């Protein structure tokens, strides 16, 4: 009886705690969600073409990850050493299904990675290659996200006054993307620079975590960089472009959602709000940071000068397309992938029935 109870506790205990934490988290952020979704009627005041722009930018963000997946899984095959990789359809289906799972099930990126890996492996990709690819993609996209605040701080200090139209933020996203590509390339090819960044980060981290030294953090950062370089090899420039495109298209979608409301704010301040919201999305308490992102984003937008009404409606438009739209798309992608997998699977041979049967 005791071993049975022990197995049940080990199997379901962590899940029960996770569900309780999720329920508490949703209870805390429920008023914010109610306020955001309560502004639904205001969406009718937005021109239709702004919806098209935001959808196109979000699709561009997702397509960048599909491209990154194809680059990470590219390998030489055959006697002539030709390059081969997963199809666009498989890469898209795996990402959409994983992304949807990460937005529905608590666990976020971890859940998304497991589902994405499962689809890629069942599509015929070697498990070791898939594990290496997903790890490298995670390191690269996380590095790009961590780089954004570093580039945002100088822009906040020397940035121009608020523009009459936030559409200039779309131009800023392009400029930031160029700087990020250049800086990321330097990180991947210049080891002394990576080591110096690691030592500087280690000194800061040592203040709050005494067992972390400058040299240990530097060595860890160099090892992580080497894993990314080994995974993408000579395709690293394209990989940087894809990872940067994923973030900057997503940021541009937020800018477009606010521009649709005639918001007047510095694009650099909106970028900082975006960075914080993406960090909140990593909180594993609620699926995809649901509620925490809405609360943090609306609060920060108000702090940078956006009116409360515009902040709520802009957040609703952005999250409606960037968070909620991919969920049904992921379900459809998973269903389509299952049907396609079943159709491609060879029929099971049948045995002729003889008289003795």
Task: Name what the model sees in each region.
Residues 37-45, 120, 220-232:
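A short amphipathic helical element positioned immediately N-terminal to and/or at the very start
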Residues 25, 35, 64-72, 116, ...:
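Hydrophobic/aromatic residues in alpha-helical transmembrane segments
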Residues 22-23, 50-54, 97-102, 210, ...:
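Short alpha-helical transmembrane interface motifs in multi-pass membrane proteins
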Residues 1-40, 98-211, 290-357:
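Transmembrane helix-loop-helix hairpins in multi-pass inner-membrane proteins
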Residues 76-77, 258-283, 287-317:
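Membrane-interfacial helix-loop connectors
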Residues 59-74, 102-114, 282-293:
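Short helix-coil transition sites and intra-membrane helix breaks within transmembrane domains
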Residues 214-261:
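Alpha-helical transmembrane segments and their immediate interhelical loop/hinge regions
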Residues 64-97, 258-273:
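Membrane-embedded helical hairpins/re-entrant loop segments and their flanking transmembrane helices
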């Amino acid at each position: 009886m005791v071993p049975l109870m022990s197995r049940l506790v080990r199997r379901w205990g962590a899940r029960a705690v996770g569900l309780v934490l999720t329920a508490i988290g949703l209870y805390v952020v429920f008023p914010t969600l109610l306020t955001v979704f309560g502004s639904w009627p205001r969406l009718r005041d937005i021109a239709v073409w702004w919806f098209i722009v935001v959808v196109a930018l979000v699709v561009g963000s997702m397509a960048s990850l599909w491209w990154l997946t194809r680059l990470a899984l590219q390998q030489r095959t055959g006697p002539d050493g030709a390059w081969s990789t997963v199809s666009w359809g498989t890469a898209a289906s795996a990402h959409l299904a994983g992304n949807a799972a990460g937005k529905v099930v608590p666990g976020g990126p971890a859940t998304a990675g497991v589902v994405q890996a499962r689809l890629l492996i069942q599509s015929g990709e070697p498990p070791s290659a898939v594990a290496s690819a997903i790890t490298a993609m995670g390191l690269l996209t996380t590095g790009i996200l961590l780089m954004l605040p570093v580039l945002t701080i100088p822009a906040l200090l020397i940035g121009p006054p608020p523009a009459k139209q936030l559409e200039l933020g779309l131009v800023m996203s392009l400029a930031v993307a160029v700087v990020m590509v250049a800086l990321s390339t330097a990180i991947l090819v210049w080891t002394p620079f990576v080591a110096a960044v690691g030592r500087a980060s280690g000194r800061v981290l040592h203040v709050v975590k005494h067992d972390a030294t400058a040299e240990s953090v530097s060595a860890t950062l160099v090892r992580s960089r080497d894993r990314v370089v080994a995974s993408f090899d000579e395709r690293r420039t394209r990989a940087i472009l894809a990872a940067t495109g994923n973030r900057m298209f997503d940021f541009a979608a937020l800018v477009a959602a606010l521009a649709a409301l005639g918001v007047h704010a510095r694009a650099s301040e909106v970028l900082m709000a975006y960075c914080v919201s993406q960090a909140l999305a990593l909180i594993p308490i609620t699926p995809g940071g649901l509620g925490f992102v809405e609360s943090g984003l609306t609060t920060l937008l108000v702090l940078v000068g956006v009116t409360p009404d515009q902040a709520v409606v802009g957040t609703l438009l952005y999250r409606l397309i960037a968070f909620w739209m991919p969920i049904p798309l992921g379900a459809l992608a998973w269903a389509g992938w299952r049907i396609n997998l079943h159709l491609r699977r060879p029929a099971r041979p049948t045995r002729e029935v003889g008289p003795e049967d």
